[in-house]
């Protein structure tokens, strides 16, 4: 009987620089899902790859004095090396410069052109080369004016300067698919996850009206050219999205993989590109009369304390450094445990070291070490066979083991990785407590308690086996080391199916003579300092920029500004704007409405309940038809806004001086 298939993809990464921990986050998450599904018995296909066309790549190659392919080959080698270091179990790696991909892009474009879904027109808009994205005037950050007209500004995504571009372009008529797309959303309510992303797509992009999409460029040459009009290069997002089916051999001489694995079960990506995957990609597939993927999951960003991590800002964490110094398992564990998948999370060196020391070294490592040491001490290394529960504590542990598997499975199916790991660690902690409750050192002094002591050891080893099996999707080394030290070498006992019934070790086994520490304990202070130093690479002369200062003011000028503490009690998107949020704040003596340009950096759910600083004596203004009675303070660096948060102990209405 053929196995049920499962097709999972990551975004294809843009190789304009070295990848950072944020890229590793997406790919490790995909790997965890792939390994978990394989353990469940699925025929899994896991795809990742690189998006290699566009103006930015062309400019990078020229600057390096290389051809585009020479530049790309070097970058892709580094990416593949990182994936190997992370032990990513992908089944394929697609490059958009490969012929198997370009062939599909050409055919798809010509088909859509022939059937009238693509038409020729002219496009004018504000374009950011690094982001490879067009923006409307209302989307620009720090717009520059001359005689009342916008003459420039910055990308809301990265803070890069934009330029006004006007050129002949092909357009994809996505607006005609609006009703069909909304109907698909209604029929498939779990298509976009988390649900907040779905609401964002509908309210911010679909309801205001989908504008037809420019899908070609003529201002550069590096990309897939339109066969019937070669001066046009297919726009990066149409080119890139097709990778999910070109990698399966769609429109090739052999479509067996496509027929077997499509539609995809999960497309994984970071939240900034969910719009392309949840709107443009489904519409493109509808136009091609192909089945749509089952789920699009947009995870949050890994943030630093100073905002979003990005290559262009230079505040990145290099996963190579973490792996080389602390090992792969510690790195993978931190990413999946500390950061709730689907929401933003903050990377801190302190949390990384704490997770390694407390969770891995103390809880798991010590449990394995203590258990093996006791089996050696009390039974000369020969673990007695499992006899069933002999005590109510045994019954409690067995019930908890089965319940842990159930809860873990529910969390894994909904991609709540941190919750799944938390469930496993509760079980590990309970097992450590079981040692203290059963007091093996006391039982060992009484020969009449030999059977009871042996059964305690059997339960400890079985619990450790349960934990090791459940950790296999996350940790690629520790479970193997645990099985080796326990001398569990039957592959069936390492599979997910072996957890359906407690107590499979019905024959005695000989554990290792001397337990080996799986996770060495770290010197917290030294390692926190090391990670912080690695995150602060010295700037080159080329990177250093003098930040202009504003004119000095005296205290009288500052005293004119009234700033008070307030709590955000409600927030929603402003219709027809993807930049503005309408926010209600509680100032103790009154409530006010403030319109703030932070929608690119926060969802309404992100900010409700936050204590913020509000300028309360600004003249009221109207933005997009909405009254704004003040300004919420935020910090800006490289185009990224971060709210200035206040301690919760500060009362609403308190004046900030």
From Swiss-Prot:
The keyword Cytoplasm applies. ATP binds at residue 311. Keywords: Aminoacyl-tRNA synthetase, ATP-binding, Cytoplasm, Ligase, Nucleotide-binding, Protein biosynthesis, RNA-binding, tRNA-binding. A motif ('KMSKS' region) lies at residues 308-312. Its EC number is 6.1.1.10. It is an enzyme of class 6 (ligase). One of its GO terms (molecular function) is methionine-tRNA ligase activity. A motif ('HIGH' region) lies at residues 13-23. One of its GO terms (biological process) is methionyl-tRNA aminoacylation. It catalyses: tRNA(Met) + L-methionine + ATP = L-methionyl-tRNA(Met) + AMP + diphosphate. It is found in: Cytoplasm. SUPFAM superfamilies: Anticodon-binding domain of a subclass of class I aminoacyl-tRNA synthetases (SSF47323), Nucleic acid-binding proteins (SSF50249), Nucleotidylyl transferase (SSF52374). Residues 557-657 form the tRNA-binding domain. GO terms for cellular component: cytoplasm. Homodimer. Belongs to the class-I aminoacyl-tRNA synthetase family. MetG type 2B subfamily. NCBIfam families: metG, metG_C_term, PRK12267.1. Is required not only for elongation of protein synthesis but also for the initiation of all mRNA translation through initiator tRNA(fMet) aminoacylation. This is Methionine--tRNA ligase. It comes from Staphylococcus aureus (strain Mu50 / ATCC 700699).
